[in-house]
Amino acid sequence: NFPKGTGFPALPAPQPPEDLPLASVQAYSIDDSQTTEIDDALSVTGLGSGQVTLGIHIAAPGLAIAPGSDLDKLGRQRLSTVYMPGYKITMLPDEVVQAYTLDAGRANPAVSLYVTYDEASLDVLEKTTRLERVPVAHNLRHDQLDHIVTEEHLAQDISQVQIENIPQSLKDVWNELSFLHKLAQHLKHQREVVRGKPENFSRPDYSFRLQGNGKNEPDGSETVHISTRKRGSPLDLIVAEAAIVANSSWGQMLADFGVPGIYRSQASMAPGVKVRMSTKAQPHAGMGVKCYTWATSPLRRYVDLVNQWQVIACARHGATAALAAPFKPKDADLFSIISNFEATYGAYNSYQAGLERVWTLKYLEQNGIAEIDGASHRDDAAGGALARA
């Protein structure tokens, strides 16, 4: 996939528009400590007023990278960041990532979705999309905070949580996280009603960390550390449900304005029915939503950047967005992007999985492990989890 190497040509980071208004929120991101491409952040306003507004703020390279530009061509070639244990090959140059990542301590260009809820019933009252600069107060790291932000602790006031050295950044947003967790549980339940069965979080996530080679590309001599993290933690749930709200809401907005986008759909959850990518807004049975795009990771996935351009056109032009959007209905470019993305993204994921297997064997070798107890997991047709020891 990289016949000319993984380096970047000398391309400056384009500057965002100077007339972006400053949002009156204090946002915070929730990511792993290794994440440098911070695409999304959240904010909550109006707690205790009866109407609470959730802000979902997405990094906005699409405000400055023009379709057809050299940076666009570069993104279209790479199509995604490539992840592997101890290393990654980013989709965009580091100068661009650093200019648009949602770093704490500054106001960052963002495409923001604001959803206002009735505080008691959690019914949706209003949705609006804005292009703005968003002050980010904190970059929270879930691997450092999961032991504090538990379901049990979120039911308490932060002053009652009996854990030493709670970071001030977490204290600042504790009440907001408590509301967001309640909202996320509500949203997940609504989707599960549509799905017809609950989502299954039985499989853990495995994190690979390599020691001994700094930030350089691994050469196989590093010491590998593998840690296990249970999926479905409160912070996981908050981030996941917020992303689903944004991706489904913006997908519907594109459809309402007659602006094409790149959608992910699934006709049913019957065995063998796969997720498809297309330019039509169709239901996603697995997610339990009427339509679903990828628009929340524009620093890491080219499809998200394409969809962000279309969302920006809607935010700027409203009912006439279809005339101003970079991609028109039945645009051959969109179909080409989908085809290339699916092939390339699949190859990247296979490469990552292969390297994870290699480093798992390295881990066994380095730790002198010759025999282990294990279990294999698979999902049955009814959605349950089967395990074999």
Please annotate each region the language model reported.
Residues N1-F2:
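Boundary/activation segment at the start of structured domains
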Residues F8-A389:
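Electropositive polyanion-binding surfaces
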